[in-house]
Amino acid sequence: MISKEKIARINELAKKAKSGSLTDEEKAEQQKLRQEYLQGVRASMKNTLKTVTIVDPEGNDVTPEKLKQEKRNRRLH
């Protein structure tokens, strides 16, 4: 995940952008930090989904086969 310092910098740049005073370097930095943040969020979400089992109202496991395979592969490593 992304560090607290980087999140603080993202917020700082966002506030500065609202006032309309970002330089080109700061805009580039903001984009880079946002992408890094999103990658962390996506990775976290994927890990969370890999632990989920989907069950229908009747109690049957209806987890998609692709997700089941990911779980099996994860246990092997």
Curated annotation (Swiss-Prot):
Q: Where is this region: Disordered?
A: 57-77
GO cellular component term, pick one: cytoplasm
What InterPro entries does the annotation carry? Answer: DUF896 (IPR009242)
Coiled-coil residues are: none
Say which domain of life the source belongs to: Bacteria
Q: Which UniProt keywords apply?
A: Cytoplasm
One Pfam family matching this protein: DUF896
* Gene3D superfamilies noted in UniProt: Helix hairpin bin (1.10.287.540)
Localization, per the record, is:
Cytoplasm
Under PANTHER family, the record lists: UPF0291 PROTEIN CBO2609/CLC_2481, UPF0291 PROTEIN YNZC
Q: Which family does it belong to?
A: Belongs to the UPF0291 family.
Per its record, how is this protein called by name?
UPF0291 protein BLi02035/BL02933
